[in-house]
């Protein structure tokens, strides 16, 4: 089949700067000169008529909220399949499927709507690049830009518009309501208003995004987090130091993972990896026992 949509690549592929799926869809709608809803409906009609499309078919809601398609679920998987098929581009890293596959569900890990760093948007424009919204900006854990140290915005500082309108008639760097640049910030993100580097509490999540782009989601084994915690438990058990093991996280949570095969929410996994001195990727890939400095396991 010939490509039915412009072959628009996702921005920042292979890096921690990867574009989010909602950003890609909004950007593609603007480049095609149609509203977001029209683009999604058109894409759905095309794959239904295309005998070469082997993916699953889904009925899309009238309106999609960003946080609903940033996890791995039937709807987000469907949109990825459809847009990859129609554009010939790879989009698998544009949503946070790791939240559904490696961690237990929590409604607080992804913010609603879009967020952005005005200084990053301004730099994209200065470099002649098309502005976009990064996947990492959707994580609640990351509230400050790690590059410019300014707080991420969730609404236009001119008029308060949140940029989620399906009437995508302007590029992503322009407010969809007032038409002014969203790269504007009332209080400068630099100098005295910059957030100290030690307050960048979301760096571990940013590193996870980077690691998943580098190694691929397919590199994560099934129940990798369970493997890590079980091996840690066995190590402390052999040394008769279970009390030290339970200092890493609550006893009930750790045993539910080691003995019952349950997972952890992202926030609990962050606490555990921090106390072990390892990355989130090592924890959920089953490598905690081999990388934890405190253990010295050969």
Question: Positions of the model-derived regions?
Answer:
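Basic, alpha-helical nucleic-acid-binding regions used in initiation and control of genome expression
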Residues: 1-298
């Amino acid at each position: 089949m010939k490509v039915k949509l412009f072959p628009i690549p996702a921005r920042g592929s292979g890096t921690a700067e990867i574009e989010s799926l909602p950003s890609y869809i909004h950007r593609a709608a603007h480049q095609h000169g149609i509203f977001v809803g029209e683009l999604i409906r058109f894409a759905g009609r095309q794959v239904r008529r295309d005998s070469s499309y082997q993916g699953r078919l889904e009925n899309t809601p009238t309106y999609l909220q960003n946080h609903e398609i940033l996890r791995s679920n039937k709807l987000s998987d469907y949109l990825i399949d459809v847009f990859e098929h129609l554009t010939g581009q790879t989009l698998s890293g544009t949503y946070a499927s790791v939240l559904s596959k490696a961690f237990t569900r929590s409604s607080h890990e992804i913010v609603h709507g879009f967020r952005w760093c005005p200084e990053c948007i301004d730099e994209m424009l200065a470099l002649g690049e098309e502005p976009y919204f990064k996947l990492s900006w959707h994580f609640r854990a990351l509230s400050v830009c790690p590059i410019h140290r300014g707080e991420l915005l969730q609404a236009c500082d001119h008029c308060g518009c949140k940029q989620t309108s399906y009437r995508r008639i302007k590029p992503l760097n322009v407010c969809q309501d007032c038409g002014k640049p969203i790269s504007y910030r009332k209080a400068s993100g630099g100098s005295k208003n910059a957030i100290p580097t030690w307050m960048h509490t979301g760096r571990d999540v940013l590193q996870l995004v980077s690691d998943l782009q580098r190694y691929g989601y397919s590199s994560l084994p099934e129940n990798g987090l369970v493997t890590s915690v079980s091996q840690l438990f066995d190590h402390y058990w052999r040394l008769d130091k279970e009390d030290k093991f339970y200092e890493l996280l609550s006893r009930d949570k750790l045993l539910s993972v080691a003995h019952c095969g349950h997972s952890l929410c992202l926030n609990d996994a962050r606490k555990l990896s921090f106390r072990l001195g390892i990355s989130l990727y090592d924890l959920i890939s089953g490598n905690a026992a081999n990388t934890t400095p405190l253990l010295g396991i050969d």
